[in-house]
Each structure stands twice: as C-alpha cells, then as structure tokens.
UniProtKB/Swiss-Prot annotation:
Belongs to the universal ribosomal protein uL5 family. Part of the 50S ribosomal subunit; part of the 5S rRNA/L5/L18/L25 subcomplex. Contacts the 5S rRNA and the P site tRNA. Forms a bridge to the 30S subunit in the 70S ribosome. It holds the Pfam family Ribosomal_L5. GO terms for cellular component: ribonucleoprotein complex; ribosome. The keyword Transmembrane helix does not apply. One of its GO terms (molecular function) is rRNA binding. SUPFAM superfamilies: RL5-like. InterPro entries: Ribosomal_uL5 (IPR002132), Ribosomal_uL5_bac-type (IPR020930), Ribosomal_uL5_C (IPR031309), Ribosomal_uL5_dom_sf (IPR022803), Ribosomal_uL5_N (IPR031310). This is Large ribosomal subunit protein uL5.
Length: 195
C-alpha cells in the first residue's frame, strides 16, 4: 500500500439516496416544473422525528425507553422536550419532560429517509400507501407512525410498550405539489390517486 494514500483524508461519501437525487431527481424536476436552473429545484432540508410520551408524567422510565429507541433508530442523541405549561387534568407540571426529538440533516437525513422508505414502511401492517393529505401548505410533509417496531433497529422482544412517533420531512419547496413530486421521486410510497 502507498503510505501517502493512507495519510490523505478521505472525502465523505455521499449517501446512496443523495447521489440518486443529484443524478436522477434533479433533472426530472427541472424538466417537470421548467426551472431555469438546477439550483431552483426543491431539496429535502431536514427530517424531524418526535416522540411524545404523555405517560412519562406518571412513569419517568417510559421517557428513558423512548430516548433509547429514538437513538437506536436515528443514530443520534435525542433532545428531551419539556411541557410549556401546566395542565392539571393530565397531571402535568410546567417544565416536565414529556417527549423527545431528533433533527437529521445532510448525510444522516438521506440515510434515514432511505431506510424509512425501503425497510420500515413495507413493515407497516395493512400498508396501502402513505396519505398525501398531510402536507402543510408550505411544502412540508408529516407522517404519523403508530408503532416503533417497524424500524429494523428495534428488537420486538425487548420493547415493553408500543409507541408511535411523528416524522416531518421539511423541504425547500414552495408548494405542496412540488414537495409531493420531490418526495415521490425520492421513493416515498404515497397512495395511488384514483383518476
């Protein structure tokens, strides 16, 4: 082996989906929406994953489990989310930890998106496609997952309680149509539209 080759820092490799976006999706979107150049093409900016553990007020151990599971799924340490105000009906005090969140960007974002679409979504029970009505009007898409066990990183035998999560895909698209086409091109399995 050449010693100089070993010492040079390697450039970070692109995620498989990021390469696919640059080579295939960008030209398709430029053609479809008639952008003047490729820099105007909407991009996936970040993915935010949120787990709300309302029962953590009574059982703090549930929050620790949610933190551990979210770290396994994303490969990143989650932030603890605290309540903003006290609600007596839910026995909730202001500042009490009630959930956790992770925000993924760049390579980690593309790798999570790839795993979500190709490994996790097909494991959803009775899956017929993701709803295309969960866009927010500004080009962002949120999907609710009912069971964390759809992710292959979670061992079903070690899960004490089934919990869900919200996954938000934030894009630079200005309209829902552009975001829908972007996510579809990246492989998001939306329900087929009846024509």
């Amino acid at each position: 082996m050449d010693k100089n080759k070993e010492m040079t820092p390697t450039t970070p490799s692109l995620a498989r989906l990021e390469t696919f976006f640059k080579e295939k999706v960008t030209p398709n979107l430029v053609e479809r929406f008639q952008y003047k150049n490729a820099m105007l093409v909407p991009k996936l900016k970040k993915i935010s994953i949120n787990i709300g553990v309302g029962a953590a007020a009574a059982e703090p151990k549930l929050l620790e489990i949610a933190l551990q599971e979210l770290a396994q799924i994303t490969g990143q340490k989650p932030q603890i989310r605290k309540s903003k105000k006290a609600i007596s009906n839910f026995k909730l005090r202001e500042g009490q930890a009630i959930g956790c969140r992770v925000t993924l960007r760049r390579k980690a974002m593309y790798e999570f998106f790839d795993r979500f679409v190709s490994l996790a979504v097909p494991r959803i029970r009775d899956f017929r496609g993701l709803s295309d009505t969960s866009f927010d009007g500004r080009g962002n898409y949120t999907v609710g997952v009912r069971e964390q066990i759809i992710f292959p990183e979670i061992d079903i035998d070690k899960v004490p309680r089934i919990s869900g999560m919200d996954i938000s895909f934030v894009t630079s698209a200005s309209t829902d149509e552009e975001a829908y086409v972007l996510l579809s091109e990246l492989g998001m399995p939306f329900k087929k539209k009846n024509n």
